[in-house]
């Protein structure tokens, strides 16, 4: 093979591989688009379900509060009604006494008067229940929770066991579940030592924790593999306040002291041998009695004796050793930083709940309006049928796609144009009678063509014996060279081109003796049939040109075989 042919084959192979890669990439992109649409529908349904459930909870809370208002009103009303009934009863008694005293003037009513006065003194003349009633709610916290509720993630998230659970299980903070664990093994020392540390439990007003780790579920594998928390001495001892008041005092051994020669005050020199833990236990028993008798002011630093301008290396070393006891810490070092969602909370002006849609994050850029390309069908319709001539609205629409009419003007204009092309009016009635006759003749001709095609397929023996090969036939059988139409009838397809080699020998052996005898007879018969075959071929070609038979019929007609069919047809194997 020449190098030029090898190069062509290599280039062809590369082109085929590139086309296959492009087909695969196109299929992946189409699949991603379909998945994107389905995922967006699913996320919308999840969002709608979540918001609806929480709205139901909020509505239930509203109904419960309304019932509480009715209950308080009923209780206070009953109390005031009872008090009012007692006062009205006593007032009636006084009215009766006044009437009797004015008209009778008897002194026998003194006992009744004293009884009424005693009742009056025992009754409370002020309302027993106050009419005050108010509604108190932390609207700022609720508004902040609503505006920062929910996020849309566009990246693939790692699947874990916690995501397989229902989302309703995540409504309660995980912090309350963690409290059931053993605090001695899971809680670090910095959380139970005295000191200021962030509180994660919910207060009375339902101010839940803002720490996301208190709300997110943790998988079981991470809990089992979790080791004990690391202990930082500086953080633990830096938060000491009154720990020495309840911790047991440790008995320390006596250490030999050396006075500093460069300082004017007494200071304890701490050597490296003092940190030897092996010698500490031996010295504890010997120096236990003498250590308790020492005065506290002998080893404490007296800062008043130090001159301000002098720098003492021993004092610097002392400060470095006791630095954890005096070092202060800042809460901003361990508090979580604010994210983008909290920048909306820095507003000074109050926003009502109806205007929550106007809230925008300060860091979010304004959305850019997408550029929409007009549909080519709509552009063609604009050119063919102007919008001003068909639009039925009070104000002409900008395009057919944005038509505000009940029936789209574009559809009506397109249907009217199609009916006009067919020679019909807007109701579908033909305008001219000549067009109906032409249409009926055209339909009859089409029916005749279909009938001829069916006849050629169902009864191939009735068609011409050897039709002319078209381009499709020449491509399907390139090794057969066609002769003239006249010779094609005389010389049909030879069986030698189709039969098995063994069958060829048998057929050739049987035909050789009779070859000379049959030659003269064939010449005579051929001359008689030439004229008839020519007429049949012309008839066949004219029928094909008139009816326009498909090329597939021509392909199957040229594949007719001669010879005995029993010799070359496939037969099933006989069982012995």
Curated annotation (Swiss-Prot):
Cellular compartments annotated: Nucleus; Chromosome; Cytoplasmic vesicle, Autophagosome; Autolysosome
Tissue specificity: Expressed in the intermediate cell mass (ICM) at 24 hpf (hours post-fertilization). At 48 and 72 hpf, expressed in circulating erythrocytes visible in the yolk sac, heart, and liver.
One term under GO cellular component: nucleus
Segments for region (Disordered): 425-447, 510-529
Disruption phenotype: Morpholino-mediated knockdown severely disrupts erythropoiesis.
Sorted UniProt keywords: Chromosome, Cytoplasmic vesicle, Lysosome, Nucleus, Receptor
Function description: Cargo receptor for the autophagic turnover of ferritin. Acts as an adapter for delivery of ferritin to lysosomes and autophagic degradation of ferritin, a process named ferritinophagy. Plays a role in erythropoiesis, possibly by regulating hemin-induced erythroid differentiation. Binds chromatin before initiation of DNA replication and detaches during replication. Inhibits activation of DNA replication origins, possibly by obstructing DNA unwinding via interaction with the MCM2-7 complex.
The protein's name in its UniProt record: Nuclear receptor coactivator 4
Gene: ncoa4
